A protein has these predicted regions:
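Beta-strand-enriched, solvent-exposed domains that form extended recognition/catalytic surfaces
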Residues: 180-268
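A Rossmann-like FAD-binding core segment of flavoenzymes
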Residues: 25, 32-114, 119, 205-236
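Glycine-rich Rossmann-fold phosphate-binding loop(s) that bind the pyrophosphate
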Residues: 19-23
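A conserved FAD-binding loop/helix module that cradles the flavin
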Residues: 143-195, 263, 267-268
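Short hydrophobic segments within beta-strands
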Residues: 18, 41-42, 143
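FAD-site-proximal beta/loop scaffold in flavoenzymes
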Residues: 1-4, 99-150
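A short, basic/flexible loop-to-alpha-helix module at the beginning of a structural domain
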Residues: 2-12
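Phosphate-coordination loops involved in phosphoryl transfer and adenosine-cofactor binding
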Residues: 11-14, 68, 77, 137
Length: 268
């Protein structure tokens, strides 16, 4: 975007785009406006990540889309000349291109967390927090895209405003004391959970457990508190879609020690 809109430069003429998220579609639009013609789009999953009908946009622009595919190798000397790609049917194909545009599988910009004493959640790539936004050191709060990759500006704004209110409440000594809390374990195709720990306290904090799956899945989401079922629902989910579980609906006993969040896919 900086090359095209700020410097008026074309970094390539025939790029291969990896990813089919919303930002990937934005890249197609930016290329189109600049007279750049992408040669193809690759997606490792069996369908586009962006919601339908937005996922139709590349095809309407004449850009082929390859699903269940992956980038194997980039060829070229001095600059990109081609890419070797494994397609969905197992064939390896050489696609001529002069650039590779990586537009998916983002991670949070959590460098400061990695360099600090704060606990990092390997699943989300962000700091571990409780339902009040407090990190492992409760003097620090976190919100927005630091907590997980790819969240909308609107959601991040509302979450940041909510966490700011909780921070103010903490300064007034209105939040419960920080504690190790209830550990949350996820299984099945669940990719991440935010927050990563809970306090069994009625003080309002973030309203939901925020979950995401790593692949398209249908089945039942089941939550157990110390082995006892407390919440269950039939769901169909896609990658990078926000999946919300209302914390108030869990009604966790105050002595709860462990929360299991399991996605039982159809057939299991």
């Amino acid at each position: 975007q900086a090359y095209l809109h700020l410097q008026g430069l074309k970094p390539f003429e025939r790029p291969l785009i990896v990813g089919t998220e919303l930002v990937s579609l934005s890249a197609v639009m930016s290329c189109r406006r600049a007279g750049i013609r992408p040669v193809a789009m690759l997606e490792r999953n069996a369908r586009a990540t962006a919601r339908w009908p937005l996922s139709l946009f590349p095809r309407l622009c004449g850009v082929p889309m390859h699903f269940s595919s992956e980038l194997l190798e980039i060829e070229g000397r001095g600059r990109v000349e081609a890419a070797r790609v494994r397609l969905g049917d197992g064939r390896v194909e050489r696609i001529a291109c002069d650039g590779i545009l990586l537009s998916g599988r983002f991670v949070p910009e959590s460098s400061l967390v990695r360099l600090s004493h704060l606990e990092l959640d390997p699943a989300s790539g962000g700091p571990r927090i409780d339902q009040f936004g407090r990190c492992s050191d409760p003097a620090y709060f976190a919100a927005g895209n630091l907590l997980r990759p790819i969240e909308t500006a609107g959601w991040s704004f509302r979450e940041g405003r909510r966490i700011a209110g909780l921070l103010a409440a903490d300064l007034r000594a209105e939040l419960p004391s920080a504690a190790p809390g209830i550990a949350i374990d996820c299984s099945g195709p669940l990719k991440l959970c935010v927050p990563q720990r809970l306090l069994a306290d009625p003080t309002p904090g973030l309203a939901h457990l925020q979950l995401r799956v790593s692949e398209a899945a249908s089945g039942r989401l089941r939550i157990l508190a110390d082995g006892r079922p407390v919440w269950e629902r039939a769901l169909s989910c896609l990658p990078e879609r926000r999946l919300l579980v209302p914390l108030a609906a869990l009604r966790l006993p105050p002595d709860t020690r462990r929360l299991e969040v399991a996605f039982l896919t159809s057939g299991h």
